[in-house]
Amino acid sequence: MAETGVDCIALAGDVGDATVCARLVADTITHFGAIDILVNNAGIIRRSPAVDHSEEDWQAIINVNLSSVFRLTQHAGRHMIAKGRGKIINIASLLTFQGGITVPSYAAAKGGVGQLTKAFANEWASKGVNVNAIAPGYFATDNTEALQKNPERSRQILERIPAGRWGEPEDLAGAAVFLASAASNYVHGHILVVDGGWLNR
């Protein structure tokens, strides 16, 4: 991006750590002077039957997938409220609406992301800050690699998707641009599903 002339910085850190979340927001504001758009996109997944799901896996996934959303939104939101505007986009999931199989902590976290989106929106809509979410369906990413490589499971998934294919990252671009732009100024607490029609069935 820097080669195109865009002013940018790359910040790294484990967003499962509360102090890192605070630092990332502070460093961004120090560099740019403001935060206009926050996309909460960090996520991990660990698969195991609920009866075997470890406390370590539970805590790791809740910290990264849910607690970081609260922390980053809170820190960035304080700044946005002070200036009277801002856009926050949380990445939810189909498991915001469904329970899933062998992913209890992931489902719990993504359900929480949906509720946090609405809770923040209820408080901040009148302050000029839009808080919404995108719920991707089955996308061809590292998180779904095990499913893609399982012929039977992949077939079952594709048979249910009316669009007949796995989603690609670029399929999310339109939703993200809409929620980050002035076109969504009257949209608050909405979870925009991008799933090829999965939830219709």
Go through each PLM region and give its residues.
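Active-site loop-to-helix junction immediately N-terminal to the catalytic Tyr of the SDR YXXXK motif
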Residues: H53, Q98-A107, A119, T144
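Active-site helix of classical SDR
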Residues: T73, A109, T117
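Short C-terminal tail/terminal secondary-structure segment
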Residues: Q98, V177, H188-R201
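The beta1-alpha1 cofactor-binding region of Rossmann-like NAD(H)/NADP(H)-dependent oxidoreductases
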Residues: A12-L24, E55, E170-D171
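Alpha-helical segment proximal to the catalytic Tyr-Lys
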Residues: R78, N122-S126, N185
